[in-house]
Design a protein with these regions (language model features):
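Glycine-rich phosphate-binding "P-loop"
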Residues: 1-11
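A generic short-segment signal for beta-strand/edge and adjacent turn/coil regions
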Residues: 1-2, 20-23
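Residues at the C-termini of beta-strands that transition into short coil/loop
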Residues: 5, 56-57
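Glycine-rich, anion-gripping cofactor-binding loops and their flanking helix/strand elements
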Residues: 11-19
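Acidic/histidine-rich catalytic cores and adjacent linkers
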Residues: 14, 23-49, 57-60, 79-225
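Short alpha-helix plus adjacent loop in nuclease-associated cores
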Residues: 59-80
Length: 225
């Protein structure tokens, strides 16, 4: 943790970049970031040679949100017909099946094999995870083309919208194959920061909040000289 700013804006991100020296900026080879346009724009000026890498965990989140949108719409349609097939299944579609217990595995196996729209959306999400395993850009591009074509023909609007978004940013997905960086560390720090905030029952001002975050998350050298 190098520094903290109070807002999630481009100006705030520019402020963070300004804390780095020219020498430090020259060492930046790649930046992991989500697809929020202001964040992308703020990277281009201070480190124009750095690759932008869209965080794969955010991509999974976008795809998961599409699955949930499909589920909610289909559940509404089924309930109108008196069909409760999808009642109580929300978490099954969002969690990793590898982490299911025996009962959850049995329940999910039964529902995912039905002819459901949400099952197709879920399959699209799971299939895309293979993208990150490719070693070469050419094979990854071929995979994406096939995956995009399949989703485009699925008639699942939320999934199609995410697929189109990923296609627009494909260049910054492919950079992951070169750098293999994510925001996993940042997400871990966010959890720690929320714990600090909860333990303090809030902070009177941002200055105190920032000091506490940097003290506990900044890897300070506290050994005496």
């Amino acid at each position: 943790m190098l520094d903290v700013v109070p807002e999630r804006t481009r100006a705030a991100a520019d402020q963070l970049w300004a804390t780095l020296t020219p020498e430090q900026k020259q060492t930046v080879e790649a930046v992991a970031v989500d697809m929020w346009e202001p964040f992308i724009r703020t990277i281009e000026k201070p480190v124009p040679e750095a690759d932008i890498v869209h965080d794969k965990f955010h991509i999974s989140k976008y795809l998961g949100e599409a699955v949930d949108q499909v589920r909610r719409q289909e559940h509404k349609e089924l309930m109108a017909q008196g069909d409760e097939t999808l009642t109580g299944t929300r978490q099954l579609w969002l969690y990793n099946p590898e982490n299911f217990g025996p009962e959850q595995s049995k329940e999910f196996s039964a529902v995912k094999d039905l002819e459901l729209k949400v099952a197709r959306a879920w399959a699209a999400k799971e299939l895309f995870s293979k993208f990150w395993n490719y070693q070469g850009e050419g094979w990854a591009r071929r995979f994406f083309k096939d995956w995009f074509g399949w989703v485009s023909r699925s008639r699942l609007k939320p999934a199609i919208a995410v697929a189109q978004r990923l296609k627009r940013h494909l260049a910054n997905l492919l950079t992951y194959l070169k750098h293999h960086i994510t925001n996993a560390v940042t997400e871990g720090l966010n959890s720690k920061i929320q714990s600090l905030k909860a333990a303090a029952r809030g902070f009177r001002n941002f200055r105190n909040y920032r000091i506490r975050i940097l003290f506990f998350c900044g890897k300070l050298n506290l050994y005496p000289l």
